[in-house]
C-alpha cells in the first residue's frame, strides 16, 4: 500500500476575481404547451435566477422537446428547483455546479430623443469592453417617440459614441453599479 501526499499552494488565476460558483439546473420537457414557456422563464428570473433559457432538442423516439436551463446561486437552487417542477410538466431536474466568469458592469443614463435610456457598460481594469443599450428602455422609448426599436437602437448607439462610451475608452465616472 502506498499513500502519496502533495504539498503546495493553489495558484490563483488572474480572472478568479471575476468568477463565482453557481448552480446549473436543467430539465428536459417534451409535453408542455409552448405558449407557457415565456411565463416560465419570466417567473424563474423574477424568483432570482441569474439566467434562464430554452434549447430545442429531440428526445428518444424522435420526440421534440426543450431543455430548460436555469443558472442560479447555490442558496437559491432549492427554491428554483421547486419552481421549475411546479411550473412545468417535468418530474425531475439535473443540477451541476458551475463557475461563471463575468465582467464587472454598470450603467450610464443618456437622454435620447427625449427619453432616458440606460447604457450597460462592461469593463475591466478601467477600460470599457462592451457598450449595450438596455433593450427594455429602447422599446419603451421607441413607443414614446413613435419610432421603430431599430431606429431607437441606432440613435442610442450614436449617442453612446458621442458621449465617448466606446470599446477601449476609460470607464466614465459616476457609473451606476449592478448591485
Regions found by a protein language model. Name each.
Residues 1-14:
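Mobile "lid/hinge" segments at catalytic clefts and subdomain interfaces of large enzymes
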Residues 10-12, 22-24, 30-179:
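Long, contiguous binding/interaction regions
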Amino acid at each position: 500500500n502506498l499513500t502519496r501526499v502533495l504539498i503546495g499552494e493553489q495558484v490563483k488565476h488572474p480572472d478568479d476575481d471575476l468568477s463565482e460558483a453557481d448552480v446549473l439546473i436543467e430539465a428536459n420537457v417534451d409535453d408542455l404547451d409552448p405558449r407557457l414557456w415565456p411565463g416560465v422563464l419570466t417567473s424563474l428570473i423574477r424568483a432570482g435566477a441569474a439566467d434562464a433559457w430554452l434549447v430545442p432538442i429531440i428526445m428518444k423516439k424522435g420526440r421534440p422537446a426543450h431543455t430548460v436551463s436555469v443558472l442560479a446561486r447555490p442558496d437559491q437552487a432549492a427554491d428554483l428547483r421547486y419552481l421549475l417542477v411546479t411550473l412545468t410538466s417535468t418530474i425531475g431536474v439535473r443540477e451541476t455546479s458551475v463557475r461563471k466568469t463575468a465582467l464587472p458592469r454598470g450603467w450610464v443614463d443618456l437622454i435620447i430623443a427625449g427619453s432616458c435610456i440606460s447604457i450597460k457598460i462592461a469593463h475591466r481594469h478601467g477600460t470599457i469592453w462592451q457598450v449595450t443599450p438596455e433593450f427594455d428602455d429602447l422599446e419603451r422609448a421607441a413607443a414614446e417617440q413613435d419610432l421603430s426599436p431599430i431606429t431607437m437602437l441606432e440613435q442610442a448607439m450614436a449617442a453612446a459614441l458621442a458621449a465617448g462610451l466606446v470599446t477601449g475608452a476609460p470607464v466614465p465616472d459616476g457609473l451606476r453599479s449592478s448591485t
